[in-house]
Each structure stands twice: as C-alpha cells, then as structure tokens.
C-alpha cells in the first residue's frame, strides 16, 4: 500500500501543534452545527445513490488495506524533547506517522480515486454443504473508484503514549461529534481538538469529501483490552482480590470509565466506524498455546466486546498469524 502514497516529508509539522483547535472543556465550536433532528452524517451516508454504483469490483480484484497506529500530535516532543530512549524513538519512527504525514496520506489516497468501504461489505460469512466459511463479495462502486479499507491498531491510548506526544482519549463534544483530548507537553494545558488526532481528522475529511466514503463507511478500530479502550481504563484488574479493601474503589472507578466511553462508542458507530479485536493482551497468536488464545479471546469478549459489540474481525498482533484450523 505504501507504494501508492506520495512522499510525506520529515517528522515535523510547520507548527508542531500550534494549529490545534482550542475549545472549552465540552468541545463547543461552530463546525457542523445542525438542528436537533438532523444528523450531519446523513449527507455522507446518502452521497452515492444506487444508480451511481455501476462498477463491479469482483472477488478476484484487490481491496487495499491501509493501517495506522495513533498518530503523533507533537513530533518535536516525540522525536527530540521527551524522555524516550533512542530505541523508543526508532519505534515511533518505524510504526507511527505524524499529523502532517497522516493528512498528506489521506489526501493522496483520495486524489488517487480510492473510496472507503466497510469490511462487512467486502466479506460475508456463509454456510453451505462444505461448512461455514467466509467469501469475498462483489462490490458495486462508483465508476473510476477503487476500494480501500483503513484500520487503526491500538486506539487504546496506552499510558506510555501520553508522555510521547500523543492525544489521550476520544470524547463527544457539545456539537455531538468526536473530539480528542490532548495535553500540550510544553505547557501542560489540556484541551479538546479535532486537528491532532486521527479519528476526528478522518471525520472532518469525510465531511469535506463525502465522495470518499461508500454508504458512510469510515474505518476500523483494532483494539486490545489490557489498558482499556479509546482512552478509558475499562479493563478489570484480576490481581485485586474480590475481598481486597482496594476492590470497591477500583470497581467504582472502572464502572465510571465504562459509562463514560459508551456515548463515544455510540457516536463512532453512528458515523461509520467499526471495531475489531487485536486480542486482549496484544499476544502473538502464532506462538501461544491454544488455551492461552481461548482465555485471551474470552477476556476480550468480556471486557471489550461487551462495550463495542461482537465482531468477526481479528487483526493479528505482530503479524503473528497461526497455522492450522484451531
């Protein structure tokens, strides 16, 4: 996929974060203002009419997949000024992109004629005489468009990332849209922004280019569970015994985080985002015993799937695809 993209420059942005949108703590602004009865995303969902979908994209044709991790909001901090080791900085360089790079990539794939499609439109589960299995569907696309799936690994906002120039969580603002919470590493000012995080950036890009989405499709969050999801610490701590004096306070905090993330999940689903598993513990599936995989899968379903809903999508951590049929 990378060969399809234009060069994205170095690991800096012109302002290193100075162009962020600073708002009140509830995320109020004037973007996408609508009345109480109209969802602005309706215009995206309905942009392509059925009679415009004249190009068949068959099962033998490639559907490109472009994946990201959370993007770096403050590259100067991440690559030069934070306390990360050199190896950690190399890791950021290998696996992450900056806000500036991300914006250029979105513009590049859009300019090349790609359109976002939903994974469930590409594949279907069928049961026939040979059993239950997945089959590729034929997509109907606008003439001249090519299908693209975008996914984001580890949108959990792990604590280590908060010290390395990333945003910290997703929230729903007063405008009903998704914002990111961010703390400026130089001033310690905490604010909401739509300009420094991959999720609201893609949201805004699709609002501005509704032809970039087929039937309102957006992207997939590939989530672990061991440090919560979407910036909320929803994970259980099984090291705290049921009769521990620390248990009531932990359970109360976890319950508050679970309630806080629910409206975020709801709005993401309403606006074309879907969810997949990256395993609960980010484990290598090709090296773990089957029972470990079963236990991990059950814990993901209990702590993550119970919030985002069931999924048929699994993203292999470390590209560790297991062999065999288990």
Where do the model's predicted regions map?
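C-terminal domain-boundary segment and adjacent tail
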Residues: 97-136, 256, 305
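Metal-dependent polysaccharide deacetylase catalytic core of the NodB/CE4 family, i.e.
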Residues: 66-78, 129-134, 141-148, 155-322
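Boundary/entry segment of secreted carbohydrate-active catalytic domains
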Residues: 39-94, 151-156
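Short, low-complexity, disordered segments immediately C-terminal to signal peptides
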Residues: 9-37
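Residue-level signal for protein termini and structural transition zones
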Residues: 31-32, 60, 136-137
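C-terminal motif of bacterial Sec signal peptides marking the signal peptidase cleavage site
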Residues: 4-7
């Amino acid at each position: 996929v990378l060969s399809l993209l234009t060069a994205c420059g170095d690991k800096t942005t012109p302002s290193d974060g100075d162009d962020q949108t600073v708002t009140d703590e509830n995320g109020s602004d004037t973007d996408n203002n609508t009345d109480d009865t109209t969802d602005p995303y309706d215009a995206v969902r309905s942009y392509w009419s059925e009679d415009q979908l004249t190009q068949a994209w068959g099962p033998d044709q490639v559907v490109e997949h472009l994946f990201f991790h959370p993007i770096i909001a403050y590259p100067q901090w991440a690559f030069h000024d934070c306390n990360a080791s050199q190896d950690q900085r190399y890791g950021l360089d290998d696996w992450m992109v900056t806000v500036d790079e991300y914006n250029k990539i979105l513009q590049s794939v859009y300019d090349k004629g790609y359109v976002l499609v939903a994974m469930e439109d590409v594949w279907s589960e069928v049961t026939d005489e040979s059993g239950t299995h997945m089959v590729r569907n034929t997509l109907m696309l606008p003439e001249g468009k090519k299908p693209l799936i975008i996914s984001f690994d580890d949108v959990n906002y792990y604590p280590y990332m908060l010290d390395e120039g990333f945003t910290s969580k997703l929230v729903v603002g007063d405008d009903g849209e998704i914002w990111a919470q961010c703390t400026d590493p130089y001033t310690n000012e905490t604010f909401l922004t739509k300009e420094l995080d991959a999720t609201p950036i893609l949201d805004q890009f699709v609002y501005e280019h509704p032809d970039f989405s087929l039937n309102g499709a957006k992207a997939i969050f590939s989530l672990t569970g061991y440090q919560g999801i979407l910036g909320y610490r929803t994970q259980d701590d099984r090291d705290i015994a049921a009769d521990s004096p620390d248990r009531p306070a932990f359970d109360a905090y976890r319950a508050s985080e679970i309630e806080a993330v629910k409206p975020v999940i709801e709005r993401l689903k309403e606006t074309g985002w879907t969810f997949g598993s990256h395993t609960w513990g980010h484990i290598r599936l090709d090296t773990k015993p089957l029972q470990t995989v079963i236990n991990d899968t059950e814990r993901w379903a209990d702590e993550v799937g119970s919030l985002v809903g069931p999924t048929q999508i699994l993203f292999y951590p470390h590209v560790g695809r297991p062999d065999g049929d288990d």
